[in-house]
Structure formats: C-alpha cells, structure tokens
Amino acid sequence: MKSCIYQKQEPVNIPQAETRTLKDVLELPWGFEIYSLLTRWNPLNIRRPVPLPDSGRKVLVVGLGPAGFTLAHHLMNDGHTVLGIDGLKIEPLSPELSGVDGATRVPFAPVHRIEDLREPLDARVMAGFGGVAEYGITVRWDKNFLKLVRLLVERRAQFGMFGGVRFGGTLTADDAWRMGFDHIALCIGAGGPTVLDIPNGLARGVRAASDFLMALQLTGAAKEDSIANMQLRLPVVVIGGGLTAIDTATESLAYYVVQVEKFLARYEALAKANSEESVRAGWDDYEREIAEEFLAHARAIRQERAQAAAQGREARIVEMLRHWGGVTIAYRRKLVDSPSYTLNHEEVEKALEEGIWFGEELSPTGVDVDHYGAARGIRLKNAKTGTEHWFPARTVFVAAGTQPNTVLAREFPGSYALDGKYFAAVDEAGNPVKPEKSAAKPAVAQVLMKREDDGRSISYFGDVHPSYFGNVVKAMASAKQGYPVVSRVLASRAPEQAGNGPDFLASFGNRLLATVHHVERLTPTIVEVVVRAPLAAARFQPGQFYRLQNFETRAPEAQGTRLQMEGLAMTGAWVDREKGLVSVIALEMGGSSNLCAMLQPGEPVVLMGPTGAPTEIEPDETVMLCGGGLGNAVLFSIGAAFRAAGSKVLYFAGYKKVQDRYKVAEIEAAADIIVWCCDEQPGFAPTRPQDRSFVGNIVQAMDSYAEGRLGEVTIPLEEVDRIIAIGSDRMMAAVGRARHEVLKPRLKPHHFAVGSINSPMQCMMKEICAQCLQPHKDPVTGETSYVFSCFNQDQELDKVDWKVLNERLRQNSLGEKLTAGWLKHCLPEARASRDFV
C-alpha cells in the first residue's frame, strides 16, 4: 500500500496517487470518454494495443462482481462476446447513458462532465452491479466508481447483462451449452458465512455480517426514503477481525443514527395524522421498550444537532453513540495479527477514529438473552488466560469468515468435482491439477475446473478459487491473470454457433427479462402476480419459489418515500411454459407485500429463480397435505405432481376466514379428498361428494376426520406415508406436535413429515447472505446443525427448532409494524398516480 520501507520519511500512499491520477483524467472535459478510450486503446500493451477482431466465440460470465466485470473487460478486448448474469437485482441506467434499453442497443450520449454521473453517496441508487463491491464494503470507497466501471463494459456492443438470473436456477450449464456458448466462467464469489455454534447463536439480535451489509446496501435500509426494515440496537459486538468486521462495525454506527431518526420522523408524522395511540396499537411489551429507546435517542440526536448549530461546532454524535454502548469488535488474536490490519491497516485506523472499540484475544462462548429471548450480552473468553468476560450486546454480528461458494456441486451431483472445500481444477487438456493456495500471483493460473467431451470448458475466478480468495483486489487479479487461459481454450476449437455477437446477445432479452403480465386480487388480503419470464417458467418444479422485486428507478414516490419492495420470497403457484408465464401469490402483511397490488401490466420486475429445492415427488404413496392460508398456493402444483406420479392425496386446507379461500378448482385438481377447514362459522360447503368440511383448526380437523366424525373415511390416516405441511410457523409446529400426541395412534410409526420452512429471507441465492439460517436439533442424538432454508426449504418437522424460527421471524417486528402504518399513510398519494388491484 505504501512505500518507504525504512519509515524514515512521509510514506507515499500509492493507492491514493493512482486514484488521483484517474480523477485528474476524469475531471477533464470529456474525461470519462478519454478514460473509456484508454481501456480499449493502450499503445503500451505490445501484445494487444487495440481490441482484437470478433472471434465469433461467446462466453457466459456468471457473477458481475469484481472478478466478473474485470474478466468481461479483458475477454471483450480479446475479441469475444460476453453475456454477464447475476442473481442480484441490477437497476437499469438511462438508455441515453448506457446505450441499452431493456435488451436493445440504442445510441448513447457522450459524457462531457464527470459530475453529471455522480450521485450523493447517501442517496445514490443501489444499482446492484459490482457484487460485493456494491453491498459488502464501506462507503468510504466512492461507489460512484462502480457506475464508471459499468459503463465501460455495458456500452460495448459485445456485452450483454441481466440481473435477477441465478445460475443453477434460471439457467444451467446444460442450458448454456444448448444456447451456443463456447465457455462458462464462474465468478460467483464467496459462499455462506461461518456459523458460530454457541448457545443462543441465532437469538433475536444475532445476525451474519453479510446479512447486515446486504440489507443495508442492497435492500436499502440505509436510505431515508426506503421502506426496508432492519432493526439494530446498541451496544453492538462484531465477532471477527477481517475487513468485513471493520466495515460492519463502522456501518453499524452510521446506520443506527439513520435508523432512529427515520423512526422518529415517521412516528411523529403518523401521530400527527392519526394519534400516538393508533401508532402504538399492536405493539407488544418488547416492541414498546425498543420504541422508547429509539425515540429517546433520536430526540437526543436532534437536540445535539440543534445545539451544535447554534454554537457553531460539530455535533458530538459519536460520543453519544459510545455512551449508549457503541460498537466493539471482538477478535480471537491480537489486532496486529488480524487480517484487516495486515491487509489494509488504514481501514482499522479510520474505524478507531470513528469511535469503534477493538477487543483483542476474545472468542465467543455464548450469547445471553433477556426474558423476551433477545440478545442482551455476549460471553467472550480470553484466548491466553482462559478468563471469561461479559460484554453488553443487544446486537451481535458474526463476521468470522466465509466458505467457498460450491453450492452447484450439491445441486448437480456428479457435474462439478470438488477438491477439499473448493472446486477441483484441471489443466487445458482436462487433466487434474492442484492450484497454489492463497497465492495472489501463482506461477501458473490454474483457472479451469471442467472440460466437456466436446472441448468446451468451465473456469472459475475470485473468491471461489483457492489461489485468489480473500478480497476485491485478488478477485480482479484472478481475472487479469486467468483470461489468457480462457482465450487459449476458446481458440482450440471452432465457435459453437455462427452469427455475430450483438444479435446473439439481443436474443436473450425475450428469455431473461421479466415483465408483469397481469395482477389479480384473489381475496381482500391475497394478490396474484402473473409474470412473463420464459426461462424462469421453464425451469420451475413443484415446491420451488422465486424472489420478486420492483426496480427502485421505476418505483413511484409518495410522502417522500420510494415505494421499492424488499425482496419477497414468492411461491410458484403455477407456470405456463408455452407462454412463459409464472404465477406467484402474495399475502399482504402491511409492508413490501402490499406493493404487489400496484404493479402494472408490462412493468419490468425482477423474478429471480426458481430457487429452493423441488419437493420430492414419490410414486405410489399416500400423501397428506396440510395447507394453511397462503401455504395452499404452494400445494397446488405439489398435489398435482403426486397424483400424476400415481400417489393418493389427502388434503387438509385451512383458513382463518371464509373470505380467505381462493383457487378452489386448482386445489380440487391437486387432491383425491379435501377437508376444508375454517376458523370462522359457517365454514365451507364442499362441491365434491368425497370432500369434507370442518369449523376449527387444522389439527382438530385431522382428529375429527380420523375418528370418522366428518363422514366415511376413504383414505385413512393409517395409510399415510408422507406428510407435507405448509403455512405459518405456528401451524407447521402444531402439525409436528400433533403427530406425536393426538394423531399418534392413527399414523404409521415411520411416516415421513416435512414442512416448507418460512425463514426470513433476503438474497435467496442459496447460502450467501445467511438471513435464512435455521437451526435443527436431531431428536435422537440432540446434536445441533444449521440449514440455509433458501437452499432447502422442505425440512423434517421433528428437527426444526420452532422457537428460534419464531424469534428470527420477529427480528424486525417493530420496524415492520411502523412501516405498515407508514405505507398506509403513503398509499393514497400513490393511488393517485397508478392503478391498484
């Protein structure tokens, strides 16, 4: 980072010198266009001073983070056509700037002043491009540079880019080969964070750092005009010593101020429009305690800002935050031994200046909770003395490293070989090789991981590679060192498909872009959104789900609030593969789900997926389906698939109110016998002779059916081989318990029972952000294990820790309730500008 090894004089800050050089060029008239030209024309590059002619080869780059966009740049300069995909939502830029409208190339205007591209860092559109450079690092780095990088690649006719596309879900390697790609490059980044197996390790208030950073800088919690909810209380303890821990600590302090000020502003506006009593209605004791804390802190910050302005001084916000508990980093070794210090000591220095505390040689042994089940403190053991210390902590962030992102090997067994924790490498002939580990500049860049029989190959870069994992710079270096290998293997065989690159790329718009087909209200609280997304529809299997989002740049604004959805986990109810349609169904809960009703036909959206695991469909079984409310939407396709496989289906469909029932014909098609259950009188009148009706809850209905109190029993519970429960966590837990209690005499001793676990979710890209972490406890051994619910949502009822699931579902409950009131306040203005169903 710095020169002067003798430390006898002021050292030279090399990164700042390089950045200053770039800024000097950019600030010239037409400076960006000059820089753009120099990325393609480089007289100092003897081997390739200008981009090579079109090679006819097409490369699929999976992941548009630092490794992905760097690789795309070099491959285009080598003459290849590149299609980049990313599972994250990527916001569109204006066509006049990017030269792209949807998937169509249009003329773009040159940039005269670089200032025209800049956005305030606290208000900029979180565009999604750049992967971890967008969501995983602090705003001390000017993220306006990401827009420049994006324009360098997006404006080129040899490049296409689609967000909301998950490799392994929407698109697979087999699909890519059939479509005519000559090579696939995996730039998929790091995988799931390390889980701390300690008591109360997933209590309310405990999160993975990746979950926090993604919610902050992609979902939009850090923005004053967003409706994203992410609850953070002081004091905060961050576990870990890497740069992610440093970023998490500094962002925690900054976010806390934004959070409480936004809470106070909306609370006061709602109280003025209605009353304080109406705002507080529905809050429980725990939520009232947090609300009083947030309101008191926000008012204190407001008062301090006013006093500072009157006295002509800086507001002492950091001192206040430290007084309220502040943020402490706890690391198992010395500060000087931490990865953050050895990699970038300046970040540590700045964090300490901002008021962070650093605790050395401390390892977590357990989280203590209060009577609400929320974190109140953490126990940390000194690594040398063995002494245990107790730190107050209302929030605990875990930044203890990540695992390689090798989910594909488990999704497609036999297709991707592993070598330890990483994908196995091969040379250009397809022979196994061992890459150097943790070597930012290996002697030989071994970046190939698979060679197909026809000579086409798959490569891997960045955090997923054993030589280059660890940081953004190494990820970019992997692409710079590895692209010649890709070009050589491409040159070793003729292009798979004739035709020019731009036409090839344009053909993907029709397949990968998602647009709203229509929106229909099914009940007073349930909305169906039908989306045209041909590849997402083609890949769907019963039981899977999607992530639905609208675009921030297209979302309406009301009361100064951008009506941008958080990522919604949406059940795939049905698909029409011929028309490329996917139906997803949302239960309006007061927050982002209420925005589904405002989506307009033809509106572009993100429908990432399908994701999750398909439900296991076995032939010749007797299956009992238990659906609660929205859960019935999932069971349409599952029941139909079981019946098509030759199984018998007994279906208990439960609802709170008579008005909540929908899609009756689809449910009837999915079951041999239905028992309609409703908590509300008079219940339902069956329309088929074999069906039954019951007023009460679903467990009571099962008991009554088994006893014959509802009429003739044609599919006895004694014949049931498999139970699938889908609904609220309380409903699924009740079904799980009833199997060992009231229903035990009626069921086979060794039947198989699963539930579709509705963990809170964010990225839904399988083992990335860790918001969906769910602990399991083996009923026989008592051992605890952890499952990412977005990887496999169908989990054995007897293993799920229902208490932890309920607590994690309520992590943001106060913010969600205030947001529900705020949206209700905003929507009249929004309805004036667009139609709602």
Identify the role of each PLM range.
Residues 1-54, 134-136, 140, 153, ...:
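Glycine/serine-rich phosphate-binding loop and adjoining beta1-alpha1 elements at the start
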Residues 1-130, 142, 183, 192, ...:
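Fe-S ferredoxin-like electron-transfer domains
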Residues 26, 30-52, 169, 193-315, ...:
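Glycine-rich dinucleotide-binding loop and its adjacent helix/turn
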Residues 121-129, 137-172, 179-188, 257-420, ...:
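A Rossmann-like FAD-binding core segment of flavoenzymes
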Residues 204-232, 367-373, 387-388, 392-467, ...:
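FAD-site-proximal beta/loop scaffold in flavoenzymes
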Residues 245, 461-489:
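A conserved FAD-binding loop/helix module that cradles the flavin
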Residues 511-601:
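Ferredoxin-reductase
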Residues 659-837:
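Reductase modules of NAD(P)H-dependent flavoproteins
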